[in-house]
UniProtKB/Swiss-Prot annotation:
Catalysed reaction equations from the record: GTP = 3',5'-cyclic GMP + diphosphate
Name of the protein described by the UniProt record: Guanylyl cyclase C
Membrane-spanning intervals of the chain: 434-454
Membrane topology: Single-pass type I membrane protein
Organism from which the protein derives: Sus scrofa
Glycan-carrying positions: N32, N43, N79, N195, N284, N307, N402
Gene this protein is translated from: GUCY2C
Coiled coil (UniProt feature): none
Keyword field contains Ubl conjugation: no
Length: 1073
């Protein structure tokens, strides 16, 4: 047994992986006058027709469609393609194993690209639901079956056999009826019999009635499932049974088998659901005795009429399953005809969603579909006449109008007085009971009058004994300065919000409390308001915040309320850092939060306060133990209700409060918790005022509500999703109360720990353990972020100051100036920089300097030098400080200067094409002092005659030349590197007199592509020559149409921001050392 199941599971997984993106790759065979129907021929069907018969029915339907289109003047081709399952894995006749088969058929269509205009089938609920769950099915699907609730509200699914939803609506309506001559009592209880031998339709009908969150279950005060024949037979004569009504599904033979000739209590009513059986309408059919206390719910033959007498020639040509396949083909033909006549495309989404709210001509007559694509029809409730032993129509139910019409107002029932009994045993209109009730009523009336008088006396006495008084202001203490509001793990903590919150927090009776503004000026409360405040004082429940009283501060009245450390539930949902989804806010925790709110509201509704009136996620707070508590309840006569996203639609239209309105608000909060999105999240609308307007003015069967994606919900989530949707029903009477919500969530919550009940302490300890583990994870994560930010700050500091200087500043707070015996200093500037600026915009100048200096910085990375600063077009570099390197300082500066000069020979300005950029370079070696100057924006500066001499060497040099002093040449001669240089001659240096200087031209055995210096020796001739070059470059730019760079606040916008300001420019920090 395990091997087939394992193979089936693996096959299902492979199919799901293969079908994830199926719809986008399938091409429809639905164009150019040729239209196909894809029929899924599934072996795994529990319905009473062979595949050969179904194929014949579909082909007959296609012929009818062709004839109808031809009569309408539409010459097109309509065909049906039949897709069969292959292999031996699908041989079971059980619909429960049809999941993989349906996906396999879709895979076949996908791989062979045979998708038609519409899918016909499958019929099994399991298969249909899985296809919609695992694929993005954007094509219309017509099903002869798919009865389950899980297939409700699918946008492209059409069902041509009555689904379970229609059955539930009838039962709820019939249970409510109490004004028919034969049914004077409304029913609120039922037993539901279910075993493992039901047909496919019965299985899903009874499954819907069993579901705890279904519409039927919500309306009953008692419902119990009977499983197995023994339980059914025991309940028939059980004097202690809780209901007289038993619902079952099957045929008359099923009733006979279960009863087995046993006696049945006279007030027992069996409701037999047998929708697709025409046995009851056949001629000469006599109802057996065991059917006399049975009411049969069925569908009439397609050609019958709605009255109590049956024609003798009524019979069904085909069974309902075959007829549904035939009508499915005719439905497609009807829609195809409409679209072709309008000349609209049938491959669009509009066609897929068009199978709604229509009536078409079926094989046996008109067929009507509702707004969900489900078939509408008229159900018959039959009874057995004790006079004629014939089946007769008791009433009819129109599923489209939800209307029950009594047909036989004087039925000849087997039950007493020809009336249906009460659903609760022992209740009925007996004369003795009437007398007892009359006497009891008189006594109760007298007692009621006495109680009213006593209650009024007690209330007046209580007000006299405890007149409302405020808490003395001197008992309210402000928070101390070292007390914080909350613990936050966010690095960018919002201090402004913290200040606002502190204004509302105080201490009372050594406890931290919140002051709630009651919008009351003088504090002279009315008697009604005092009663409300007294009720609040009496509430003490662990899921409700404690109310301590009121206090008057600064001519304002505040309510003093218990403080919860973690803030509102809305803040917790927004804080994805402290409460992440993956490790903390999981599905179990969300269920526990919903359970906490439900318990608090259930207690509040059963208390004297009775209603909240302002329930929303900001009025649900979380304490230090991760327990959710409800606050801001009561005081409805003091604080007027407001219109917001949590307000029920009936209260938006007319301002008031109610318990059912609280249930609606709970549903909105639940959607916030489940999706962890903003309040009333929906993709179709973002504006808050528009949302409120659409909720208030919504009408029809599908009112405006937030998004809750049932299609993608997991199996464990589906029951909660349905519960939430029931909470925001438009009709308040259809919403469950909080007691039922609490019980449903208690059952779901217990399943997480394989237990039905968990103590409060167990829940509390488990939550704190979960939060502790999450806190450890967050602390570790924040520590890593802190270290990363610290390293980032260090890298930035190392770019601004030398590493040794930064460490000294961090450790000692000061940097001692230091004298260096011998260093080499480099200066350079741009020749004609002012002239270039004259013909350039400011942003072009910035771009030019950025392009040049970032290239210089890259060159510095390959030498042991330290960039001191840049001022305008001047560029200063030193070697031998702050880290001493022997005689290497002169070598590194000399090679760096050669690399820079070589680069300038290839550099070209973007906004002045063809213009060479000339630089002058000066180098000098000698002693130097260095230190940090200033407190704000500290700079590492160099001092001494060596700095001035190096500057003079640059200023007295010539374009595209490296001007070197004699001291530097002397050092280079002492090294192993054989530098090439030329004697310039005697040069006058301001402050030093005349000295012999040199031109550095290269290194032996190394090639440097140095640019050729300009030939002019006269400075004025050089300047004139340079101006001519600029003019020529401007003419060239104008002729070639080169545009200036777009002005921007960030230079080099097209290439990125200034690279020497970025921290991650290079991992090589040798630039500075």
């Amino acid at each position: 047994m395990k091997t087939p199941l394992l193979a089936l599971a693996l096959w299902s997984l492979l199919l799901q992986l293969g079908l994830t993106f199926w719809p986008s790759s399938v091409s429809q065979n639905c164009h150019n006058g040729s239209y196909e129907i894809s029929v899924l021929m599934m072996n795994n069907s529990a319905f009473p027709e062979s595949l050969d018969n179904l194929k014949a029915v579909v082909n007959e339907g296609v012929n009818i469609v062709r004839q109808r289109l031809l009569e309408a003047g539409l010459t097109v081709t309509v065909n049906a393609t039949f897709v069969y399952s292959e292999g031996v894995i699908y041989k079971s006749s059980d619909c429960r194993s049809s999941t993989c088969e349906g996906l396999d058929l879709l895979r076949t269509i996908s791989s062979e690209k045979r998708m038609g205009c519409v899918l016909l089938g499958p019929s099994c609920t399991y298969s249909t639901f899985q296809m919609y769950l695992d694929t993005d099915l954007n094509y219309p699907m017509i099903s002869a079956g798919s009865f389950g609730l899980s297939c409700d509200y699918k946008e492209t699914l059409t069902r041509l056999m009555s689904p379970a939803r229609k059955l539930m609506y009838f039962l709820v309506d019939f249970w409510k009826v109490n004004n028919f001559p034969f049914k004077p009592f409304s029913w609120n209880t039922a037993y539901v019999f279910k075993n493992s031998t039901e047909s496919e339709d019965c299985f899903w009908y009874l499954n819907a009635l069993e579901a705890g969150v279904s519409y039927f279950s919500q309306k009953l005060s008692f419902k119990e499932m009977l499983r197995g024949n023994e339980e059914f037979q025991n309940i028939l004569m059980d004097q202690n049974r809780k209901s007289n009504v038993i619902i079952m599904c099957g045929a008359p033979e099923t009733v006979h088998t279960l009863k087995g000739g046993r006696a049945v209590a006279e007030d027992t009513v069996i409701i037999l659901v047998d929708l697709f059986n025409d046995h009851y309408f056949m001629d000469n059919v006599t109802a057996p005795d065991y059917m006399k206390n049975v009411l049969v719910l069925t569908l009439p033959p397609e050609n019958s009429v709605s009255n109590s007498s049956f024609s003798k020639d009524l019979s069904l040509v085909k069974n309902d399953f075959t007829l549904a396949y035939m009508n499915g083909v005719l439905l497609f033909g009807h829609m195809l005809k409409i679209f072709l006549e309008k000349r609209e495309d049938v491959t669009t989404s509009k066609f897929a969603h068009a199978f709604r709210n229509i009536t078409f001509e079926g094989h046996m007559g008109p067929v009507t579909l509702d707004n969900c694509g489900d078939i509408d029809n008229t159900m018959f409730l039959l009874y057995t006449s004790v006079d004629t032993s014939k089946y007769k129509v008791l009433l009819t139910y129109d599923t489209r109008k939800n209307y029950t019409n009594p047909v036989d107002k004087s039925p000849t029932f087997i039950w007493k007085n020809h009336k249906l009994p009460n659903d609760i045993p022992g209740r009925g209109p007996q004369i003795l009971m009437i007398a007892v009730f009359t006497l009891t009523g008189t006594i109760v009336l007298l007692l009621l009058i006495a109680l009213l008088v006593l209650r009024k006396y007690k209330r007046e006495y209580a007000l006299r004994q405890k007149k409302w008084s405020h808490i003395p202001p001197e008992n309210i203490f402000p928070l101390e300065s070292n007390e914080t509001n909350h613990v936050s793990l966010k690095i960018d903590d919002d201090r402004r919000r913290d200040t606002i919150q502190r204004l509302r927090q105080c201490k009372y009776d050594k406890k931290r409390v919140i002051l709630k503004d009651l919008k009351h000026n003088d504090g002279n409360f009315t008697e009604k308001q005092k009663i409300e405040l007294n009720k609040l004082l009496q509430i003490d429940y662990y899921n409700l915040t404690k109310f301590y009283g009121t206090v008057k501060l600064d001519s304002m009245i505040f309510g003093v309320i218990e403080y919860c450390e973690r803030g509102s539930l809305r803040e917790v949902l927004n804080d994805t850092i402290s409460y992440p989804d993956g490790t903390f806010m999981d599905w179990e925790f969300k269920i526990s939060v919903l359970y906490d709110i439900a318990k608090g509201m259930s207690y509040l509704h059963s208390s004297k306060t009775e209603v909240h009136g302002r329930l929303k996620s900001t009025n649900c707070v979380v304490d230090s133990r991760m327990v959710v508590k409800i606050t801001d309840f009561g005081c409805n006569s003091i604080l007027a209700p407001k219109k917001d996203l949590w307000t029920a639609p009936e209260h938006l239209r007319r301002a008031s409060v109610s318990q059912k309105g609280d249930v609606y608000s709970y549903g909105i909060i639940a959607q916030e918790i489940i999706l962890r999105r903003e309040t009333f999240y929906t993709l179709s609308c973002r504006d808050q005022k528009e949302k409120i307007f659409r909720v208030e003015n919504s009408n029809g069967v599908k009112p405006f509500r937030p998004d809750l994606f049932l299609e993608t919900a997991e199996e464990k989530e589906l029951e909660v999703y349905l519960l939430v949707k029931n909470c925001w029903e438009e009709d308040p009477e259809k919403r469950p109360d909080f007691k039922k919500i609490e019980n449903t969530l208690a059952k779901i919550f217990g399943l997480f720990h394989d237990q039905k009940n968990e103590s409060y302490m167990d829940t509390l300890i488990r939550r704190l353990q979960l939060y502790s583990r999450n806190l450890e994870h967050l602390v570790e994560e924040r520590t890593q972020l802190y270290k990363a930010e610290r390293d980032r700050a260090d890298r930035l500091n190392f770019m601004l100051l030398p590493r040794l200087v930064v460490k000294s500043l961090k450790e000692k707070g000061i940097v001692e100036p230091e004298l260096y015996e011998e260093v080499t200093i480099y200066f350079s500037d741009i020749v004609g920089f002012t002239t270039i600026c004259k013909y350039s915009t400011p942003m072009e100048v910035v771009d030019m300097l950025n392009d040049i200096y970032k290239s210089f910085d890259h060159i510095l990375d390959h030498h042991d030098v330290y960039k001191v600063e840049t001022i305008g077009d001047a560029y200063m570099v030193a070697s031998g400080l702050p880290k001493r390197n022997g005689n290497r300082h002169a070598i590194d500066i000399a090679k760096m200067a050669l690399d820079i000069l070589s680069f300038m020979g290839t550099f070209e300005l973007e906004h002045l094409p063809g213009l060479p950029i000339w630089i002058r370079i000066g180098i000098h070696s000698g002693p130097c002092a260095a230190g940090v100057v200033g407190i704000k924006m500290p700079r590492y500066c160099l001092f001494g005659d060596t700095v001035n001499t190096a500057s003079r060497m640059e200023s007295t040099g010539l374009p595209l030349r490296i001007h070197v002093s004699g001291s530097t040449i002397a050092i280079l001669k002492r090294t192993e590197c054989q530098f090439l240089y030329e004697v310039r001659g005697e040069t006058y240096l301001k402050g030093r007199g005349t000295e012999t200087t040199y031109w550095l031209t290269g290194v032996k055995d190394q090639e440097y592509n140095l640019p050729t210096p300009p030939t002019a020796e006269n400075q004025q001739r050089l300047q004139a020559e340079f101006v001519d070059m600029i003019a020529s470059s401007l003419q060239k730019r104008q002729a070639s149409g080169i545009k200036n760079r777009k002005p921007t606040r960030v230079a080099s916008y097209k290439k990125g921001t200034l690279e020497y300001l970025q921290l991650n420019t290079t991992d090589n920090e040798s630039t500075h050392f």
